[in-house]
Amino acid sequence: DTAIVLKQKVDAGEIVISENTHRLVEGIFDCQDLRVQSLKGITPPINAWRVRGERQTESRFDAQHGAGLTEFVGRGDEVELLLRRWERTKSGEGQVVLISGEPGIGKSRLTQHVRDRLANEPHTRLRYQCSPHHTNSALYPVVSQLSFGGGIAAEEAPSAKLDKLEALLTRGSADLQPISPLFADLLSIPYSGRYPALDLTPQVQKVRTLEALKDQLLGLASQQPVYMVFEDLHWID
């Protein structure tokens, strides 16, 4: 039957999904079409996909709208408010805006539209995606953003990951020696061949990591304005 045929196409522990499920998650997960041919008593051919892993995207919004967006309509007052705050940011006054409301009203779309409006202005863009599945993972949005911003893939060798991490950190810091081990440890990247081990208590390491993150952000902001968005803030750790 169908289950037996699909079992022959995948290895133990792999995940196979249907066509309907694939349509819902194709922007979030990397899937391979199994191309199962017609079987006796089964018409048309089976449409099934093997899930190969999670796609590296900046946010849930980007994953769900990778194919493109419709024209942005309305929200003129909100857009103008955010752009006025951006002008104040460029003059050196840091701004914080909370966008709240029921799911589906267009909060992420609003921030995306403002981001598009800033496309021709010099700035640094940071987007942090909080998740209900990682509320117990310390600094998950930061870890995810660093991995995405540095183009660090899970399957890469530790040396390649460190190279990309260092390239990312140079954007906000001149001295990488004291901070690279902290960031590498945060991203679970082995670094023993390049940096000495951190001889710190967990509490001290936590404090220094937070300080390094703050200094990195300040370093970026000293060069040009930073447009930073936290998605689904209520799920932050």
Describe these PLM feature segments:
Residues D1-D237:
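Key residue(s) within conserved catalytic/signature motifs
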